[in-house]
Amino acid sequence: MKALIFAAAGLLLLLPTFCQSGMENDTNNLAKPTLPIKTFRGAPPNSFEEFPFSALEGWTGATITVKIKCPEESASHLHVKNATMGYLTSSLSTKLIPAIYLLVFVVGVPANAVTLWMLFFRTRSICTTVFYTNLAIADFLFCVTLPFKIAYHLNGNNWVFGEVLCRATTVIFYGNMYCSILLLACISINRYLAIVHPFTYRGLPKHTYALVTCGLVWATVFLYMLPFFILKQEYYLVQPDITTCHDVHNTCESSSPFQLYYFISLAFFGFLIPFVLIIYCYAAIIRTLNAYDHRWLWYVKASLLILVIFTICFAPSNIILIIHHANYYYNNTDGLYFIYLIALCLGSLNSCLDPFLYFLMSKTRNHSTAYLTK
């Protein structure tokens, strides 16, 4: 189990380097980034789509495809398909999604602020407190950036805050998800060691272990989020007359296979491996506690709340992430991206649910279980 945890952490730290080296080694275009984020497709005004001559009536020659012609200079003004315009102007994008973000903001900001206050002033310095503090900080940072996302959607998906803030908001938006996932996995591993291997756990330098682990989580997430901050995120759409943030990319940007590897590795190491670890940890915890004392079942129910939050908030978006980018890479279509945006909106609920997880655990802690959270 320990070897698996260390191997997963090592791969998490090394994979961003591989992705970055893939971006640097593309010889087709050394002046531009080679890892465009696959959102809705947008084409510059003076480009045209591929067209097979075999589609012409009466054509009897060989099948020839005219490749897309792109301008040599980088374009900030793009055209999008009617389906994309329909989503960007729909009630789903301009009313429902901002309404959910508003709910997360209204509940999440005070809830995480109170959680941080309790962790700093009402709770002793213990291992789990370090993890919960970092989780609350990540959620609070996410919640305070939501007003920009809310204004963006209410304004018809028109971004008015500039490129730098667009990139920063995107980094925090995605970074919170994977930071929360990794921290919830760390909390699960901590409980697994405390309950299943109590003697080993008591001999660990728990406070140092928690601080180092949280530092590695933040560093790993930061490295993985670098492409979102390096690449251009803001594009002006000619037809709807709006400026999008992250939702549209230029199809004429140079591309490489590393874009697919990057997002698959992001979902695999940022979601699947932590998910498997959480299932393993809680299965072992339930088996251990149930074997000794059925009165522990109330604690098991509280612990399973992490698994519920994990499954509802993070599973849909990461599963759709893999399918969307595989579909985009092999079929060059972006039809699943709007479903991915809905799943991301659902995932944002995690930021207002995490504080209640801490409140629940603080209420259920007593003298007989205190050693589990030290």
Curated annotation (Swiss-Prot):
GO terms, biological process: blood coagulation; G protein-coupled receptor signaling pathway; ligand-gated ion channel signaling pathway; platelet activation; positive regulation of insulin secretion; response to wounding
Which UniProt keywords are listed? Blood coagulation, Cell membrane, Disulfide bond, G-protein coupled receptor, Glycoprotein, Hemostasis, Membrane, Receptor, Signal, Transducer, Transmembrane, Transmembrane helix
Q: Which Pfam families match?
A: 7tm_1
Residue numbers on the Extracellular membrane side: 39-94, 149-167, 231-260, 323-336
InterPro entries membership: GPCR_Rhodpsn, GPCR_Rhodpsn_7TM, Prot_act_rcpt_3, Protea_act_rcpt
**What's one GO-annotated cellular component?**
protein-containing complex
Q: In which tissues is it expressed?
A: Highest expression in the megakaryocytes of the bone marrow, lower in mature megakaryocytes, in platelets and in a variety of other tissues such as heart and gut.
Cell compartment(s), UniProt: Cell membrane
- Those parts of the protein on the Cytoplasmic side are 121-128, 190-206, 281-297, 362-374
Q: Which family does it belong to?
A: Belongs to the G-protein coupled receptor 1 family.
Q: What protein name applies here?
A: Proteinase-activated receptor 3
Species:
Homo sapiens (Human)
What gene, per UniProt, encodes this protein?
F2RL2
